[in-house]
């Protein structure tokens, strides 16, 4: 199971590299999807079921909408592809560092899991994250304020990306 988490960490790092190093917003959006999905699986592995679901909905539901609007307003007829020697060198270095970390800490994680195996763990059905859910839905005002805050963020990004002229109609 640890190797699955390591794969998600590698996917997370590669997604961050694609977002940072990509010259075109289309490929950055693809990297953002990799970062969101792998980060949510890492949170899910550590026991945050509701938190990972909320993060997927926020990243892929809210941030991708803003990213699509931004990409539509700054559309390139011929987007540049991610590539080059520097990027491949970065990818190989990240994979080597992750592999070296996995090999050096592999025995440590096995010792910790063996030590925790004999412990008397009595976990309940409800985790600590459910307390935040009840607080969030107990007062409906918080939900309304969160929705308005996301709407204001969307419009502020659209104003920033709009440009000097007529916004999305400038290509027409």
Curated annotation (Swiss-Prot):
<feature type="transmembrane region" description="Helical">
    <location>
        <begin position="141"/>
        <end position="161"/>
    </location>
</feature>
<keyword id="KW-1278">Translocase</keyword>
<comment type="function">
    <text>Core subunit of the mitochondrial membrane respiratory chain NADH dehydrogenase (Complex I) that is believed to belong to the minimal assembly required for catalysis. Complex I functions in the transfer of electrons from NADH to the respiratory chain. The immediate electron acceptor for the enzyme is believed to be ubiquinone.</text>
</comment>
<feature type="transmembrane region" description="Helical">
    <location>
        <begin position="25"/>
        <end position="45"/>
    </location>
</feature>
<dbReference type="InterPro" id="IPR001457">
    <property type="entry name" value="NADH_UbQ/plastoQ_OxRdtase_su6"/>
</dbReference>
<keyword id="KW-0830">Ubiquinone</keyword>
<keyword id="KW-0813">Transport</keyword>
<keyword id="KW-0496">Mitochondrion</keyword>
<keyword id="KW-1133">Transmembrane helix</keyword>
<feature type="transmembrane region" description="Helical">
    <location>
        <begin position="108"/>
        <end position="128"/>
    </location>
</feature>
<feature type="transmembrane region" description="Helical">
    <location>
        <begin position="1"/>
        <end position="21"/>
    </location>
</feature>
<keyword id="KW-0812">Transmembrane</keyword>
<dbReference type="GO" id="GO:0008137">
    <property type="term" value="F:NADH dehydrogenase (ubiquinone) activity"/>
</dbReference>
<keyword id="KW-0249">Electron transport</keyword>
<keyword id="KW-0520">NAD</keyword>
<dbReference type="Pfam" id="PF00499">
    <property type="entry name" value="Oxidored_q3"/>
</dbReference>
<keyword id="KW-0472">Membrane</keyword>
<protein>
    <recommendedName>
        <fullName>NADH-ubiquinone oxidoreductase chain 6</fullName>
        <ecNumber>7.1.1.2</ecNumber>
    </recommendedName>
</protein>
<feature type="transmembrane region" description="Helical">
    <location>
        <begin position="48"/>
        <end position="68"/>
    </location>
</feature>
<keyword id="KW-0679">Respiratory chain</keyword>
<comment type="similarity">
    <text>Belongs to the complex I subunit 6 family.</text>
</comment>
<dbReference type="GO" id="GO:0031966">
    <property type="term" value="C:mitochondrial membrane"/>
</dbReference>
<dbReference type="InterPro" id="IPR050269">
    <property type="entry name" value="ComplexI_Subunit6"/>
</dbReference>
<feature type="transmembrane region" description="Helical">
    <location>
        <begin position="86"/>
        <end position="106"/>
    </location>
</feature>
<dbReference type="InterPro" id="IPR042106">
    <property type="entry name" value="Nuo/plastoQ_OxRdtase_6_NuoJ"/>
</dbReference>
